[in-house]
Amino acid sequence: MTNIQTWIDEYHKGSRFGLNGDVLIKQKSQYQEIIVIENEYYGRALMLDGCWMTSLKDEKYYHECLVHPALSSIDEKSNVLIIGGGDGGTVRECVKYAQISKIDLVEIDEEVIKISKKFLKEIGGEAWHDKRLEIHVDDGVKWVKKTRDNYYDVIFIDCSDPSEFSNLLFSDSFYKECKRILTPKGILATQSESPESFKNIHINILKTLKNIFKVSETMYSFVPIYPSGIWSWTFASSEDLNLSKQNYDEILKIEKGCEIWNLNFQNAAFKMMPNKIIKELDS
């Protein structure tokens, strides 16, 4: 079904967020239903199994916040792993760093990559052709299990909300395996859901990472297309995590290519934890 104008809604606990426009593609992959719609305000937007994943209008709120706090603060960043990220946005932000030698993108659903390359070209752009990128159509959990110890400097978990095929990406055992394959000073960076719409999942992620890693920090910002509009990203490490330790010359170069992220934005975002979340984490 293509080029049919209609409303497409995401439903969440008695509420809904919808976009009206032309449906460019609607198909069922092995894992999920994939829809791309063209909306007057948000531009092209991607929905997976009834949940909005990204749009051309606001995708940089998500991708820049996931990537740059980790990569701008770690000295050694040769090997990077992205789990999920089939729209190409996380890859695009990673390739801005010349020190990276290799990026492994592990996406379970090849159709997401194909459709993103065709209908959401503005997101991945030329990053799809970067020589450092290797794309693996594979299960992220299985990939991590078969990876040797201390291999990756940074791991990005850029996955959808918990579902039948992604639940294990939020599990205790998976985070422990990620810790195993990280270098001693490596950083795990993960989207950690909304403190409002997915509060229980959010709390569970934060508590789990706090128990597994020596230190973890969470930042909050806006992704308008997501339920409640507020989202979070959590960064964890087995060593001291100093996300304010920056190479300022490098930061200035990166900031120039960003629409949302800069160092002041980041520093403020790490101080935005709602008090109700603090209370639950301390209980």
UniProtKB/Swiss-Prot annotation:
Catalytic activity: S-adenosyl 3-(methylsulfanyl)propylamine + putrescine = S-methyl-5'-thioadenosine + spermidine + H(+)
NCBIfam families noted in UniProt: PRK00811.1
GO molecular function: spermidine synthase activity
Location in the cell: Cytoplasm
Origin species: Prochlorococcus marinus (strain MIT 9301)
Residue ranges occupied by any PABS domain in the UniProt entry: 5-238
Catalytic residue list: 158
Enzyme class: transferase
Keyword Zinc attached: no
EC number: 2.5.1.16
Name of the molecule in the record: Polyamine aminopropyltransferase
A biological-process GO annotation: spermidine biosynthetic process
GO cellular component: a single term: cytoplasm
Residues the record lists as binding spermidine: 63, 87, 158-161
Subunit details: Homodimer or homotetramer.
Pathway(s) it belongs to: Amine and polyamine biosynthesis; spermidine biosynthesis; spermidine from putrescine: step 1/1
Binding residues for S-methyl-5'-thioadenosine: 32, 107, 139-140
Family label: Belongs to the spermidine/spermine synthase family.
Gene3D superfamilies: Spermidine synthase, tetramerisation domain, Vaccinia Virus protein VP39
Record function comment: Catalyzes the irreversible transfer of a propylamine group from the amino donor S-adenosylmethioninamine (decarboxy-AdoMet) to putrescine (1,4-diaminobutane) to yield spermidine.
Keyword tags: Cytoplasm, Polyamine biosynthesis, Spermidine biosynthesis, Transferase
Gene: speE
SUPFAM superfamilies hit by this protein: S-adenosyl-L-methionine-dependent methyltransferases
